[in-house]
Amino acid sequence: IPGGLSPRSVSDPDVQKAAAFAVQEYNAGSANAHYYKELRVVEAQSQSVAGEKYFLMMELVKTKCAKTAGKPKVYKEIQNCELPPIKQQEEKLCGFQVW
């Protein structure tokens, strides 16, 4: 539907690309000393407006990987970061728009 929101499969490759971009940008803009990685995409929608715009609801979790100034990690590296023990894990539910 032009201009309207359409549900998308959370496993769709384009949704996964948008999610990877969202995680990298979230970490780049976050003042937290550690990286957050994707636990899962909860919901995904898209809108066709001069390209594809994605609306994502994602669960993120804080990792043990500390950020190093001038050496940002890429999505695949972030996803390989270890997690703290279950009781010490910090999870966030975040909404992202990727265009």
Curated annotation (Swiss-Prot):
Record flagged with keyword DNA-binding: no
Places the protein is found: Secreted
UniProt-listed CDD domains: CY (cd00042)
Keywords on record: Disulfide bond, Protease inhibitor, Secreted, Thiol protease inhibitor
Domain called Cystatin: residue spans: 3-99
Record GO terms (molecular function): cysteine-type endopeptidase inhibitor activity
Site feature (Reactive site) residues: G3
Motif residue range(s): Secondary area of contact: 47-51
Highest taxon in the source lineage: Eukaryota
Tissue: Expressed by the venom gland.
PANTHER family reported for this sequence: CYSTATIN-M
Function noted in UniProt: Inhibits various C1 cysteine proteases including cathepsin L (Ki is 0.1 nM), papain (Ki is 0.19 nM), cathepsin S (Ki is 1.2 nM), and cathepsin B (Ki is 2.5 nM). This protein has no toxic activity and its function in the venom is unknown. It may play a role as housekeeping or regulatory protein.
Protein name: Cystatin
